[in-house]
Amino acid sequence: MPLDPEVAAYLEAQKLLPPRGALDIAATRERLRQAAILAGSPPAVARVENLVLAGYLRARQYWPIIDSARPLLVYFHGGRFISGDLESHDPICRMLALAANCRVLAVDYRLAPEHRFPAAADDARLAVEWALGQGIAVAVAGDSAGANLAAGAALAHYGAALRCQLLIYPMIDATCSEPSYTEFAEGYGPGAADMKRGWREYLPEGTDARDPLASPRFAADLKHAPPAWVLTAECDTLRDEGEAYARRLGIAAKRYPGTIHGFFTMPGILRVAREAMADAATFLLSHW
C-alpha cells in the first residue's frame, strides 16, 4: 500500500529537519511541543482548568460545556516516555472534548530519563484514581507511550468499571521484536531506533522487558479489561504489537492505510487524521 499523499508530503518536509536521533532530550521535547501546530488551530472549549493532583502531578481539564455530569476521558500524551506535555497535545485534547462531548483530563506525567519506570505508570494510575473519585463515567486514552499508560491503568483498575479504553498506536512491548520493527525501521517518521531509545531511557537497567507493568501486552489476564478500540498505522514500527494486543483483547485493530506513527495528532494537515478523530469520537460516544 503506498503512502497517503498528504503523509508523503509531510515526510518529505521532515527531511529538512535534523534526524530525531541527533537531538538531545531538551531538543526532542521542544520538537514535539512545536509539532502541536500540525493539529491545526486549537478550538475553543467552555472551560480549561489547570489542576495539581496529589500535590505534584500537573493536569489540565477541558470542558466542552459547563456540566459536572459530563463523562471524563483521562488522556495520556505520547512522546516515547521522554517527551510530550500539556502543551504538545493541547489541541488534540480540545478536539476530543468537543467531538466526544466529554471532559478530558490531560495528564502531565513524569518523563524519563529524569524519572524512570515505574514513575509514569504510577502517575497514570493516580490520575485514573482521581478521575474515578469524581462520581462520573470514566474512560482512558492515549497515543504511543501514552497508550501504554492508558492500557496499564485499565489493567490496574479492572474492578472500577472504566467505560472503555482508546489506544492509539500503542507502544506496549519493550522487547521491540515484532516484524514491523524491521519493515518500518527507517523512513516513516519515528522509527525503530527512536522507539528503542525511548525504552532505554524509560526502563532502568535490568528491567524485564516482559514485565506487564512496563509492557501491558504481556499481562496474564485480560478477560476483565474494559471495552477497547485500538488504532494502528500501516507504516509504523509499533503496528504489529498494537494489533497483537487488540487480538488478545478479542477485537480487531483499526489499521489506517498509508499512514505513519504520529498521524493522529496531525488533523491540521492530514485528512486521514480527521477521519481517525471522528472514528475515535464515535467509539467514545458509544460507551458513555
Language model regions located:
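A glycine/proline-hinged amphipathic helix-loop "lid/cap" segment
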Residues: M1-P64, W288
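Short beta-strand-to-loop junctions in surface cap/lid or active-site-entrance loops
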Residues: A59-A69, R217-L222
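Short beta-strand element of the alpha/beta-hydrolase
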Residues: A69-G79
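Gly/Ala-rich beta-loop-alpha elbow adjacent to hydrolase catalytic centers
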Residues: G142, G146, A150
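Serine-hydrolase catalytic core
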Residues: G206-T259
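Catalytic active-site module of serine/aspartate enzymes centered on a nucleophile-bearing elbow/loop
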Residues: G268-W288
